[in-house]
């Protein structure tokens, strides 16, 4: 990390939103899903930061990536070792300034951090859904997020923001609910996955599914966990999130013991790092959820319904766009972001594009990179609430209460 980045990281930690408390919205109206099934009822766990203005025109939705959740900023307790996953960007005086915006982040359906997913009880059976939880898509998530928006009494968002899989949700929001999105910020994303990215996801899924402790997804019934499979899936994913330059700078060919051991145990520092990332992930994530999230990635293709024409798919979009990519991101390369930009321009939309110099790879969207934060802060500061959706009302959907 450069001196500038280190100073920025220290500065943002001192400007936290503080202690935050997750909330749960309960919905009793069925949600029809793309797969043909429906959820008869469901819960969404979310957090909010900042204050909603009187006009209801300053709300911002944050969409999380594959392993993310609702806890985007602040701390749940004073003893927490780390803040939320995007605390560097959300808070007083930060790029997504909570002195100005009312920020909402939720755990998506199929998640494992409180929203309805494989770990939740299926009302039909009285047992956890497990592998019987329906396949969910990015469009399904956006429909559920729209209901949460209405539950909160909002008529729309000043901005919808997300990185990676979160950026795909932003793109889907702008297409599915064009009147509800004033600004769309798509970071390190793509209009659909390449064959290579689908292949990475399939290898990860096979690592989980072929683990003897997976039991067809019913590992809870056997008091088991597919630890090795989920660990391998995370190790593979983590390699794709980093760049060769970042791995060379951080690990090189360093040996843990200082000399070659001529064996198959961990010898190189990069091996140790990947195993740590894999084993720690197993303790905080669910294997069935991981399978669902990767499938949502694979299925995302908003142009498909428009004869594979992304320009046509974007025809009704009304949002202004900021699209951001990172030079060393090979999972979703800058060219994939430029595809989105070209399609937006061809459909006559307003779009700003920034390609950020970084050696952090795909994970750069989570980093405190000074120029990246200036771009994001500058864009957000120029949002005019006079042109954003406004209106605060009571909930449209029957929610069955919330805590």
UniProtKB/Swiss-Prot annotation:
Active site: 164 (nucleophile), 329, 362
GO biological process, one term: methionine biosynthetic process
EC number annotated for this UniProt entry: 2.3.1.46
Reaction(s) catalysed (UniProt annotation): L-homoserine + succinyl-CoA = O-succinyl-L-homoserine + CoA
InterPro entries, per the entry: AB_hydrolase_1, AB_hydrolase_fold, HAT_MetX-like
Binding-site residues for substrate, renumbered to this chain: 234, 363
Residues annotated as domain AB hydrolase-1: 58-366
The protein's enzyme class: transferase
Site (Important for acyl-CoA specificity) residue list: 331
Biological or metabolic pathway of the protein: Amino-acid biosynthesis; L-methionine biosynthesis via de novo pathway; O-succinyl-L-homoserine from L-homoserine: step 1/1
GO molecular function: homoserine O-acetyltransferase activity; homoserine O-succinyltransferase activity
Pfam families per UniProt: Abhydrolase_1 (PF00561)
Alphabetical UniProt keywords: Acyltransferase, Amino-acid biosynthesis, Cytoplasm, Methionine biosynthesis, Transferase
GO CC aspect terms: cytoplasm
Protein localization: Cytoplasm
Disulfide pairings: none
Function recorded in the entry: Transfers a succinyl group from succinyl-CoA to L-homoserine, forming succinyl-L-homoserine.
Subunit organization: Homodimer.
Protein name: Homoserine O-succinyltransferase
Organism whose genome encodes this protein: Halothiobacillus neapolitanus (strain ATCC 23641 / c2)
């Amino acid at each position: 990390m450069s001196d500038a980045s280190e100073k920025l990281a220290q500065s943002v930690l001192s400007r936290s939103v503080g202690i935050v408390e997750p909330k749960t919205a309960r919905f009793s109206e069925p949600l029809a899903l793309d797969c043909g099934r429906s959820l008869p009822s469901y819960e969404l766990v979310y957090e909010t930061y900042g204050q909603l203005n009187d006009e209801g025109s300053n709300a911002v939705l944050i969409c999380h990536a594959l392993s993310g959740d609702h806890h985007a900023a602040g701390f749940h307790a004073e003893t927490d070792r780390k803040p939320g996953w995007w605390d560097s960007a959300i808070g007083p005086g930060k790029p997504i300034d909570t002195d100005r915006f009312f920020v909402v982040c939720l755990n998506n359906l199929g998640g494992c951090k409180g929203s309805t997913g494989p770990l939740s009880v299926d009302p039909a059976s009285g047992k956890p859904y497990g592998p019987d939880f329906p396949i969910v898509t990015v469009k399904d998530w956006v429909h559920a997020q729209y209901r949460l928006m209405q539950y909160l009494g909002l008529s729309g968002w000043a901005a919808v923001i997300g990185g990676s899989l979160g950026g795909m949700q932003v793109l889907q929001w702008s297409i599915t609910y064009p009147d509800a999105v004033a600004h769309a910020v798509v970071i390190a994303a793509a209009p659909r996955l390449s064959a290579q990215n689908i292949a990475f996801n399939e290898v990860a899924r096979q690592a989980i599914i072929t683990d003897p402790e997976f039991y067809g997804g019913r590992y809870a019934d056997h008091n088991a966990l597919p630890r090795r499979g989920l660990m391998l899936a995370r190790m593979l994913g983590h390699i794709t999130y980093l760049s060769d330059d970042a791995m060379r700078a951080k690990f090189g060919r360093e040996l843990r013991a200082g000399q070659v051991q001529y064996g198959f145990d961990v010898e190189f520092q990069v091996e140790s790092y990947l195993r740590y990332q894999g084993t720690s992930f197993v303790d905080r994530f669910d294997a069935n959820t991981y399978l669902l999230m990767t499938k949502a990635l694979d299925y995302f293709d908003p142009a498909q319904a428009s004869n594979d024409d992304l320009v046509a798919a974007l025809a009704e979009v009304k949002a202004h766009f900021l699209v951001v990519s990172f030079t060393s991101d090979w999972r979703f390369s800058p060219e994939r972001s430029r595809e989105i930009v070209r399609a937006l321009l061809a459909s006559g939309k307003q779009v700003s594009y920034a390609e950020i110099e970084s050696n952090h790879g795909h994970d750069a969207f989570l980093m405190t990179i000074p120029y990246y934060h200036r771009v994001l802060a500058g864009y957000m500061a120029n949002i005019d609430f006079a042109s954003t959706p406004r209106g605060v009302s009571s909930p449209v959907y029957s929610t069955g209460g919330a805590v």
